[in-house]
Amino acid sequence: MVMSVINWFEDRQKFGGLIGAFLEEATRSSMTNERDRRISVNANKGLWARCDNCGNMLYVKFLKQNRSVCEECGYHLSMSSMERIELLIDPNTWIPLDEDMSARDILSFSDEDSYETRILLSQEKTGLTDAVQTGIGYLNGTLIALGVMDFHFMGGSMGSVVGEKITRLIEYATQRLLPLVLICASGGARMQEGTLSLMQMAKISSVLQLYQVQNKLLYISVLTYPTTGGVTASFGMLGDIIIAEPKAYIAFAGKRVIEQTLRQKIPDGFQAAESLFDNGLLDLIVPRNLLKGVLSEISGLYLSVPYNKN
């Protein structure tokens, strides 16, 4: 029986040696500009992806089956917001909220491209209206409110739409006494919106105060690569339970900014999830394929306790 090249690879999820060397050599020139940035896994862009940690060539079909985790080194590659929703929410139970909300360029901001152009390009690239998806759905049979940031939309930056959608999600969860899960992936506040983007930090923190303290409801924050800037400085670190993916980059300011400001060298891994966990800033580091089960157990434990608003 004649076997196609694709079928041959599908029978062998691990490939290396001469094949891996050949593939690396054949794609080296085209990958030069990609070496220093994370690879977004998208089947429409080809059959192969490259792990940003170990450099191994990965067959996209198997990579997606493995939740975008490198099977060679265990590195967690980036995921779209829709992929994360499909990972956590039971099939056919997802109900999006405020999905038609889109940003406006009220400051007429422009650098290389206008803000309006950047929004349109990101919308075309991702199919999203902005850098977060919010909604409700069942997680192993438990109804939760879920917000998922998408780094592929303008670096997951937080502007007025992101802040408003998350705020409305928290208010919705408060009214219906739902557990809240926010998946963070962001480069920080969106500079194109100026002060409007910065005020989202205070706005979200305020509604979380009502949700957590006054109503005693459960908020779980999940930090992924990368979670930085205004998201880290606000709702990212306000969870009752704070979870991170392995080796996630979590910071307020970048390493170079810190070193230039303090005029001293900071150690490697200083802003990795494992370092934050060792210093008591995180509660758990959970591999991606175990996250749904962990969230389900925490939510189930919380819901098993009789609700007492006082």
Curated annotation (Swiss-Prot):
Its EC number is 2.1.3.15. It is found in: Plastid, Chloroplast stroma. Keywords: ATP-binding, Chloroplast, Fatty acid biosynthesis, Fatty acid metabolism, Lipid biosynthesis, Lipid metabolism, Metal-binding, Nucleotide-binding, Plastid, Transferase, Zinc, Zinc-finger. Pathway: Lipid metabolism; malonyl-CoA biosynthesis; malonyl-CoA from acetyl-CoA: step 1/1. Acetyl-CoA carboxylase is a heterohexamer composed of biotin carboxyl carrier protein, biotin carboxylase and 2 subunits each of ACCase subunit alpha and ACCase plastid-coded subunit beta (accD). Zn(2+) binds at residues 51, 54, 70, 73. Binds 1 zinc ion per subunit. GO terms for cellular component: acetyl-CoA carboxylase complex; chloroplast stroma. Belongs to the AccD/PCCB family. It catalyses: N(6)-carboxybiotinyl-L-lysyl-[protein] + acetyl-CoA = N(6)-biotinyl-L-lysyl-[protein] + malonyl-CoA. Residues 47-310 form the CoA carboxyltransferase N-terminal domain. The gene is accD. This is Acetyl-coenzyme A carboxylase carboxyl transferase subunit beta, chloroplastic. It is an enzyme of class 2 (transferase). A zinc finger (C4-type) spans 51-73. Its cofactor is Zn(2+). GO terms for molecular function: acetyl-CoA carboxylase activity; ATP binding; carboxyl- or carbamoyltransferase activity; zinc ion binding.
